[in-house]
Structures are given as C-alpha cells and as structure tokens.
Design a protein with these regions (language model features):
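Flexible "cap/lid" loop of the alpha/beta hydrolase fold
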Residues: 98-139
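Short beta-strand/loop motif that positions the catalytic acidic residue
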Residues: 182, 188-190
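Active-site glycine-rich loops that stabilize anionic/oxyanionic intermediates
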Residues: 26-31, 94
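Active-site nucleophile elbow and catalytic-triad environment of alpha/beta-hydrolase enzymes
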Residues: 162-178, 193-195
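Conserved acidic catalytic loop of the alpha/beta-hydrolase fold
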Residues: 72-88
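Conserved alpha/beta-hydrolase
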Residues: 45-64
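The serine-hydrolase catalytic nucleophile loop
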Residues: 29-42
Length: 239
C-alpha cells in the first residue's frame, strides 16, 4: 500500500468482494464520518459486497493540510491513499465531486458518481482574507458568498487556515470542464432544491454516455437522503 498523509477509514464486506473498492469523497469543510459514515454509505456498500475507503480530504477532519492544495495535487494524494488496484469506483459530493473529476487521470476509475457538483468554479469570488479576518474575531463579511464560507470554515472542529489554503489552491486551477475530459461511465446526481448544482445538466453532454438523476432535497438534504444512495448503488452495481 502506498503511504499517504490522509486519514483513511477502510471497510470490508463480510465475504469475498463482489466488485472493486469504492472511494467516497466528502464536501468542503466536512469530513468522511459526517458525509458518509453517519449517513450509512459504508454499511450499504459493504452489504453489497464492496470494500469502501473513506478519507478525510487534506486540511479536513483528521487529515493534515498539504503544501500544494491544487486539485491535481489532491488527486495525486488520493491516488496514493487508494494504492495499487486494478479498478476503483468513486463517489464524490460537492468538493468531493470536483476532485473526483480529476481522478481518472491518476487512478484506474471504473465508474464515477458525481453529486452536488457545481458546473462552475464555486470559490472564484470568495474573499479569503475577509473570511480569515472573521475567523480571527472580525466582522462577518458583507458579501453573502464570503460570509457563507466564513461560517463554514469557523464551524466547530474546523481549521480555518487549512480550509482557506484549500480554497486558494482550488482557485489556482479553476474548474473548467471540457468535452472529452471524462471518458468513464458517469452518473451526475443533484438535489431538486440545490442552488450549488444549478446548471449541472450542462455537464452531461461533455461526458459520453453519462446521465443525470434529480433527487429530493437541497445541497445537504440530497446528500443525506436515501434516494442519492440508491441511485449511486444502482449505478455502481451495473455490470
């Protein structure tokens, strides 16, 4: 197994594996237990015979921040966490979906499920300095987006400096999806009331053979709801 600095929780089925491992990638300012373990994903996947890997992204949860927090650098670190496998399925949500987009370049990805994905770079307009000033005891930023990010990075248990560094790295490689960038079977999933993934349907024509399912809920509700998990499991268990 390749060494990695990331905290990774691994789950195994009771019997022989029925398919490749599944890598679950959480959203910004969250962690693996919050997004995946508490919502029952490892239990559902191992019951279907699948090994599961649940990392904390760099600077999130129990994982230290990386010096380089660009999407490509994080993808390389995630590939190291997975190690040498012949195939892997990936489910990403929000930031996790953004990073999952990069993984077929560095991992033998068999299938992708991308949930809650913004078709645009979501951090481009964030005033990182203002968010950090709030974290240091200053005023809440007037800009609504920056204020929302400021609240996220100062939530209990979060590391504001590490999360701000993550934002800065992501902005150095803005999300600019192009036709043909993904060639693996892909399912997009979006909450019906999720403003973050508004416009996600524009990504479907860029990925040959992909589809889009809409499930109930806003950005957080869609992640926690059973319909998203059901849609992902159905796609991942397709031969």
């Amino acid at each position: 197994m390749t060494l990695t600095s990331l905290a990774v929780r691994r789950f195994a089925p009771d019997g022989p594996p029925a398919g490749p491992p599944v890598l679950l990638l959480h959203g910004f300012a969250s962690d693996g237990p919050t997004d995946w373990i508490s919502t029952g994903w490892p239990s559902a996947l191992t019951a279907a015979g699948r090994p599961v890997l649940v990392p904390d992204l760099p600077g999130h949860g129990s994982s230290p921040a990386l010096a380089d927090t660009t999407p490509k650098a994080i993808a390389e670190e995630l590939a190291a966490a997975v190690g040498h496998v012949s195939d892997v399925d990936v489910v990403g949500y929000s930031l996790g979906a953004r990073l999952a987009w990069e993984l077929p370049a560095v991992l033998p990805v068999r299938r992708l499920v991308l949930g809650g994905l913004s078709p645009h770079e979501p951090f481009g307009a964030v005033d990182v300095e203002a968010a950090l000033a709030f974290a240091a005891g200053g005023r809440l930023p007037a800009d609504p987006l920056t204020a929302a990010i400021a609240r996220m990075i100062t939530a209990p248990g979060r590391d504001p400096a590490a999360l701000a560094r993550c934002i800065e790295g992501l902005r150095r490689e803005p999300f600019a999806p192009e036709a043909g960038a993904l060639t693996v079977p892909t399912r997009f999933v979006a909450g019906r009331d999720d403003p973050v993934s508004q416009g996600i349907e524009t990504l479907v024509p860029l990925v040959p053979g992909s589809d889009l399912l809409t499930v109930p809920g806003d950005h957080g509700g869609a992640l926690r709801g059973a319909p998203f998990r059901t849609a992902a499991l159905a796609f991942l268990t397709t031969p």
